[in-house]
Every structure is written in C-alpha cells, then in structure tokens.
C-alpha cells in the first residue's frame, strides 16, 4: 500500500468532498508493469481492427510505447503517489500582496476524445501564514494536467489544491488553452481558444483585486 504525503492526502480529500475527483476508483491493485502489459494487449487489438500491420518494423512496438506513455508520461496525475513534494515557508516577512506565476506551460488530455489540450496557466495567491516554493505551483498545475480532463475542472482542482495547502481562500487560477478535439476533429477549428477562470476569497469578493488579477493575465 502506497503511503501518501500529508499534502497529497489533504488535497485528495478536499477534492473528493467537493465533487472534483469524479473518476478515481480507489487504490489500483494491479502493478504498473501489469497495467502496461494489459494496455499494450488492448492496443494491439485496436490497431488490428484498424487494419494496421503489426509485423511492420515501424508499428511493432507501438502498443508498448503507448502503454508506457499512458502510465509514465501522460497520466501520472491519476496517482496521488506522484503528487509533488511541497515546500512551505513560514511567512516571517509578512508578505500580504499578490504573488503571481504567469505562463505556466501545461499539456493535458481531453477526457472525451483523448486528444491534447495545450495551454498556459496563471496562478495568483495572497499569502497568509505560509508562502509556497514557486516551482511547486508549476508542479501542482502539471500534476492535475496529467490526467484525462475538462478545462473547467482542471482550473477548479488547481484552485482548491492551493487553497488547501496554503490555508487561505485567496487564490485565483486562469487557464488559456487550445483543444485538439476541436482543432483536429469535428468542427476542425484551428484558431479558437478557451479561457477558464476560478476565483476564491478576496479575488471573488473584491472587484479591485479581481481586476488586478485579470490585468496580470492580459500582460504581454
């Protein structure tokens, strides 16, 4: 049984309590390598049904590459054992102004078609008793992006995770992204983008603070 860090457990429970963990079925009994083998076996069947020749040198290892990619590279955010180690620093400097990390690169996967979501996030918070190591914000964004997602939920998950870890509601998150389920199929719109915003605490209650955050997002 995997023992989660305190922060990972807190975040998981907060998301479950708020209906923001709709898919996770509990602890996976199969080991990682066993899951890879099963995914590869199913992928072979799919490729065969597509009339692809798995004896071809270029395709022979594709089922295994896809299995590895799903478990190790694209979807590690499904396992809270991979939640980033969090560094909190006591706010001895009494910082009480907005801290913002802009242009956080994220790559996620549309849960409806398993196609790419390619975007950037901006995260702001106003410190209370602790501040967080800046790179940890990027890592939290990446963790929740590395799972099948819809952008609206992803934005809310990042917000609630940071509120839980930092012990303050004063957090704001905005994500700007291109969805390849729109760009590469269906309507095939190659220019549209989607922006989602989730605001907490003073970012929601104070028009001035909200506008300051929105101006930060729009900076070039």
Swiss-Prot record:
The keyword Transmembrane does not apply. Pathway: Cofactor biosynthesis; 7,8-dihydroneopterin triphosphate biosynthesis; 7,8-dihydroneopterin triphosphate from GTP: step 1/1. GO terms for cellular component: cytoplasm. GO terms for biological process: one-carbon metabolic process; tetrahydrobiopterin biosynthetic process; tetrahydrofolate biosynthetic process. Its EC number is 3.5.4.16. Zn(2+) binds at residues 110, 113, 181. Pfam families: GTP_cyclohydroI (PF01227). Keywords: GTP-binding, Hydrolase, Metal-binding, Nucleotide-binding, One-carbon metabolism, Zinc. It comes from the Bacteria. InterPro entries: GTP-CH-I_C/QueF (IPR043133), GTP-CH-I_N (IPR043134), GTP_CycHdrlase_I (IPR001474), GTP_CycHdrlase_I_CS (IPR018234), GTP_CycHdrlase_I_dom (IPR020602). It catalyses: GTP + H2O = 7,8-dihydroneopterin 3'-triphosphate + formate + H(+). PROSITE patterns: GTP_CYCLOHYDROL_1_1, GTP_CYCLOHYDROL_1_2. GO terms for molecular function: GTP binding; GTP cyclohydrolase I activity; zinc ion binding. Transmembrane segments: none annotated. Belongs to the GTP cyclohydrolase I family. HAMAP family: FolE. Toroid-shaped homodecamer, composed of two pentamers of five dimers. PANTHER family: GTP CYCLOHYDROLASE 1 (PTHR11109:SF7), GTP CYCLOHYDROLASE I (PTHR11109). This is GTP cyclohydrolase 1. The gene is folE.
